Amino acid sequence: MSKVVYEGWMVRYGRRKIGRSYIHMRYFVLEPRLLAYYKKKPQDNQLPIKTMVIDGNCRVEDRGLKTHHGHMVYVLSIYNKKEKHHRITMAAFNIQEALMWKEKIECVIDQHQDSLVPSGQQYVSFEYKPGMDAGRTASSSDHESPFSALEDENDSQRDLLRRTTIGNGPPESILDWTKEFDAELSNQSSSNQAFSRKHWRLLQCQNGLRIFEELLEVDYLPRSCSRAMKAVGVVEATCEEIFELVMSMDGTRYEWDCSFHNGRLVEEVDGHTAILYHRLLLDWFPMVVWPRDLCYVRYWRRNDDGSYVVLFRSREHENCGPQPGFVRAHLESGGFNIAPLKPRNGRPRTQVQHLIQIDLKGWGSGYLPAFQQHCLLQMLNSVSGLREWFSQTDDRGQPIRIPVMVNMASSSLALGKGGKHHHKSSLSIDQTNGASRNSVLMDEDSDDDDEFQIPDSEPEPETSKQDQETDAKKTEEPALNIDLSCFSGNLRHDDNENARNCWRISDGNNFKVRGKSFCDDKRKIPAGKHLMDLVAVDWFKDTKRMDHVVRRKGCAAQVAAEKGLFSTVVNVQVPGSTHYSMVFYFVTKELVPGSLFQRFVDGDDEFRNSRLKLIPLVPKGSWIVRQSVGSTPCLLGKAVDCNYIRGPTYLEIDVDIGSSTVANGVLGLVIGVITSLVVEMAFLVQANTPEELPERLIGAVRVSHVELSSAIVPNLDSD
């Protein structure tokens, strides 16, 4: 008898071989080792239509919102990393049901993580040899590690997900301004809060909202473009209810958004991204000032803490040209951050933040400050409109229907939910799988299972200064005294604070890492001195991805090898029409036998993926871009594909940003404004046990105002 973890009616979603999509109601059953679905609620030993064995290699991919036959559904795709072609795609008409299934399946996957036993023989890194293909030929890094269960609580909350893909990341032009808001809400650190106060000032309080204005001056925007402004308010409703209203452009929007005239869907890019046309109703001397309209890309995501982020930015589209009688405004960035708060008196509460940075264009926008101010406040007042709409609306107990952009569905398929029961089955998993393959031909001919295609922390405890100094002393080691003058890269080294198109070594104390007592009190300390010295940085470009850059003749790693030094080379690969690679060369005299870093260097890929961590910072640049990058530590091997090449005197880590749509989207928007940014990155090996603590940085780098044109094409001939 198999124990049923979860079951119920869900939507089977897919596309037939002739290209037409379909949705059907199917009964899904989740067991501890199996996910299956049936045409009807199963009886006795009834064979399922299709099954999938659930183990630690399975993933739940969030495909976002899709419209089919007048219904908007929230799509999930479950697959095994070892057999990506074999997957089950399911959907729900309401967000809560889809998220419940997602949570249940992920819990089952987590229970199987312990079955993935690390084996140095199973995943063996190789040493590169001349003549081998320059492509991705090193050992596989597509395997998870059981050590990931020991990640920071605050890290796992906002990480690029190790197990779940949240769909395509923000499009290249979209700026995610919400990361700092996440830090504020989580009270991640006092420095983050001070950083936020430094860049915002409270402008006024209006209609129960706090209106803030950004203090940061930017020189790359026209005079007519306003500073970013945000409205912050509390709405007594769930995040899902508010998200439904924010995403809709039907008649309901007139009841809470006083700046909305009308809108339509221009193009559905994927489940998380759409191009919209939006006419504004600004009502400011309409006889003199022409009305404004917008064509923008909208991207949304749901975070692990239950919050929703909706981002906007203007975009040109061939099917949405300028309209007669309207001035096309330019939305530099904007959107909503919808985050849950603790309930009060049994009622749900949500903090809604609405940010807008817009250039209204036209003759008056640059010379009539009152016009700009009036329009911005009118648009920001939509937060108070949301609050009042929910306070005056009854009968909100029914499940939230996901809004349809065009031709909102007035009727829906009945979502029958069977009562809880334990499905009896005497068949083994292998027998069930084999039988279900045969049953598909005779029982699911109208429901083709071919894969459909779509375009591609917690608060930290207070620490005393004395404790921090004590931990820092324990991690300090004598300087390596390496002569850096013999190393060079094509990106210039410059320690001047205002230098451009260059790099310098970051102060380790800018980053916080796990202290000696982290397992007991979750305390983090300034990182202090690096384990290795950063000696050179290369900035490359090519028409294809650049793998194994250490083979380039005369590179810093080869120079280090000639001097008897060991190198760790991090090759950050940025995909695109032109591929870029930023290569960091870290050097040390020797590996300490038995140390965590030595185990990382000589371990297998599974162990490396479970431990390699990145801490990003963006100290200078557009405030909105800073939020899209954030400052939360990320286990790189869980977020993107990392290819490890172990040589006699080096370890090269090729970090393929293009392997993650989330990371690719974030990095894509950074590339667009890279010349205005100063970015800091720290690399380290995560410590999980008291014996491994405290953590030490491998190294850290600060890259300032990099010019894309300064990248060179490397000569990577193997000989």
Swiss-Prot record:
GO cellular component, one term: plasma membrane
Span of domain START: 180-392
Pfam name, any one: START
PROSITE patterns hit by this protein: PH_DOMAIN, START
Annotated PH domain residues: 3-110
Gene name per UniProt: EDR2L
Function recorded in the entry: Binds to phosphatidylinositol-4-phosphate (PtdIns(4)P). May regulate the salicylic acid- (SA-) mediated resistance to pathogens.
Residues that span the membrane, as ranges: 665-685
This protein's name: Protein ENHANCED DISEASE RESISTANCE 2-like
Gene Ontology molecular function: lipid binding
Topology within the bilayer: Single-pass membrane protein
Record's comment describing the protein's domains: The pleckstrin homology domain (3-110) binds to phosphatidylinositol-4-phosphate (PtdIns(4)P).
Keywords: Cell membrane, Endoplasmic reticulum, Endosome, Membrane, Plant defense, Transmembrane, Transmembrane helix
InterPro entries on file: EDR2-like, EDR2_C, PH-like_dom_sf, PH_domain, START-like_dom_sf, START_lipid-bd_dom
Gene Ontology process terms (BP): defense response
Region of interest (Disordered), residue spans: 134-173, 414-478
Biased composition (Basic and acidic residues): 462-477
Subcellular location: Endoplasmic reticulum membrane; Cell membrane; Endosome membrane
Biased composition, class Polar residues, residue ranges: 426-439
Residue ranges with Acidic residues bias: 442-461
